[in-house]
Amino acid sequence: MSFSRNQVLKGLKTKKAKPKKNPTVDELFEIAIDLEESGDRWRLEPAKCLRFYQKSLETYDRYLLQCPNDFDARFNKARLLLNMATNCDMLYKDSQVCLQKSIEMHKHALLLQEAPDIWFNLAQVHLNLAEIWVDLDREDLAYPEIQQALQSISHSIDLQERERIEWENTIQTSSQQKYEEIPDIQARRLYFIEADKEASTLVTEIASLACSCKLLEESDFEKLCQIMLPITEKLDILKLMDWYLAKTKRLVLGGKENEVAWIDLLQVFDHQLSQLPQLNLQNPLDPNSSVKPLHIQLLCDKADAYIDFAETLLDSCVSTEESASIEIMTRAWNMLGVAAKSLKMANTYNPNHVRILISRADLEIQRAAIPIMVAQNSKLVLYKNAKVLYEKAFRDYSTKKTTRTFAEIVLKHYQLQKLTNPETIKMLDSLTEVAQEDILNTI
């Protein structure tokens, strides 16, 4: 998820005025900001969010025609393109176009001025592109983006630290009288602390993805471990789990760690869940309801971790003797069963969470594909469960037909029918060939 930074923008309005037919240059800038903020407020409605963002983009373009060297406008447009890709649930093809344009706009802005925030956002753009390429099974294209993301966030951290040191020196060298004149000392100090946490979180996300890449050389892996060492002291365990899991998986597969280390790490999720207060789902005024999102996130993260472990076990069966292979596949089946229970519990906390419904359906199909007796005996039930889950997701998302998620639901439901009842296949809704191809590339 994007958490791109905003700068303090010139001329930001506190009171909205009715737009004029022929706005001045400064008014164009303010209108673009208003439209962008309106899009932000409609993030839960991707189509409406996209319409506001597109109008904002057009307005920034009109402004930049008259003020091509305005850093704030270029910064805003670069960020807006990033947010379009991350907030509007577009097809990967369209997201990639937005992200590539965002890179170009970031580079134009950097020619005008270097700032930590723009390097930070640029790192996010490269990371988002890398994640799309990984999903498309193109690690050869993902890895250069990961490298660019690491370079960009390193620039951001260096500039941020330089700013912090200069600011601290200003305070220390000021006399008592001048010291009192320095505005918002505490607020500025908190800003640097928060910026450091954000940067550490982003580095962790990039390092986790890098660690899962086969193209990562051993020397680069060791450098990543050194980079992450101080970060592990700044962030809590939940924000570090992706890194720990990716690192441990690499060490286990490389024969440098015992499998037990990976299994022990999976237990962290249960420990963290046990620390959270219990929720009363029957009581809408439950005082513990504020921790519900954390429950859901932990359960989904736990499911992802168990699925990854199971998939690694299944991959290892290719070069294993038949008797041992059956034992390994049975372990994978059990792991996927744990993941299924976690997702079901997460769905209990939020029955209409479409991504959880899709993940549950995907998992049922994955379990049915394991060539062992228990899976084959359960196949029809698992397929039926998946069909029901896709159809519920479709009903909950039927008004969002322009999104990638909608296309994913429709096509996965269609593909499932090919496995269960190929004689009477019917699509839930029509899809363009472009949308079908976009989804098929990731199934």
Curated annotation (Swiss-Prot):
InterPro entries noted in UniProt: TPR-like_helical_dom_sf
Localisation: Cytoplasm; Nucleus
This protein's GO CC annotations: cytosol; nucleus
Keywords (A to Z) from UniProt: Cytoplasm, Nucleus
SUPFAM superfamilies on file: TPR-like
Domain of life: Eukaryota
Family: Belongs to the UPF0656 family.
Record-given protein name: UPF0656 protein C926.02
